[in-house]
């Protein structure tokens, strides 16, 4: 067994004493609260505010469970993968390549990871694939806008998935293609709530 010098022993002992003191104060009694999510900025913040304006009306009409959606970018990875396909190609309509399909397959990993914690709702901003295998096409469907009529259509698209009414969180991504900004969003809620 390796011998410790006095300084190493005292350092180790001091660390152990500090841990015991924390335990005695109840530091290990409960889970630590997660850090507050980063406040949205720029276009993300504007988009979430515009969506929440429409969402609140749906809440008042009894069509959704929560009065507003909280920005939670945990699902952004999945929608960002989709958005980057368009950004990299610099076209809002894309015939999917083998490489694109591999990227889209990565979304399944995000989905599996997210579904451990969240139930997933609807999404808006990207079309369902059309065409035959080898020539499947997807497109960005909503140019970025915070105008009420556009946001209403965007939220209606999210709401096409019936369980979206339970949503409490939203992830957004605003890809820029050929100088135009588009918007993509997905909603979800905590399974443990």
Regions picked out by a protein language model, each given a short descriptive name:
Residues 32-112, 168:
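Short, well-ordered surface patches within globular domains
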Residues 27:
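Short, conserved catalytic or interaction motifs in soluble domains
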Residues 16, 82, 86, 158-161:
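Alpha-helix boundary/capping residues
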Residues 14, 30-31:
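Polyanion-binding and phosphate-handling cores
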Residues 23-24:
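C-terminal motif of bacterial Sec signal peptides marking the signal peptidase cleavage site
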Residues 3-4, 42, 55, 193:
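Short N-terminal secondary-structure initiator segments
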Residues 1-20:
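N-terminal secretory signal peptides and thylakoid transit peptides that target proteins
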Residues 102-193:
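A well-ordered secondary-structure block
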């Amino acid at each position: 067994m390796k011998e410790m010098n006095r300084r190493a022993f005292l350092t180790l002992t001091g660390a152990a004493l500090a841990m015991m003191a924390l335990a005695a104060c109840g530091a290990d009694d409960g889970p630590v609260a997660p850090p507050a999510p980063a406040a949205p900025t720029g276009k993300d913040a504007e988009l979430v505010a515009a969506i929440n304006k429409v969402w609140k009306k749906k809440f008042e009409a009894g069509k959704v469970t929560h009065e507003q959606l909280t920005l939670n970018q945990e699902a952004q990875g999945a929608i960002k993968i989709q958005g980057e396909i368009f950004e990299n190609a610099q076209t809002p309509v894309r015939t999917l390549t083998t490489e694109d399909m591999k990227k889209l397959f990565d979304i399944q990993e995000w989905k599996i990871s997210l579904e451990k914690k969240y139930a997933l709702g609807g999404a808006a901003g990207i079309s369902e694939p059309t065409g035959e295998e080898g020539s499947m096409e997807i497109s960005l469907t909503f140019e970025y806008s915070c105008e009420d009529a556009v946001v209403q259509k965007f939220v209606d698209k999210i709401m096409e998935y019936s369980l979206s009414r339970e949503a409490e969180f939203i992830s957004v991504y605003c890809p820029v293609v050929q100088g135009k900004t588009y918007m993509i969003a997905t909603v979800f809620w905590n399974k443990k709530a």
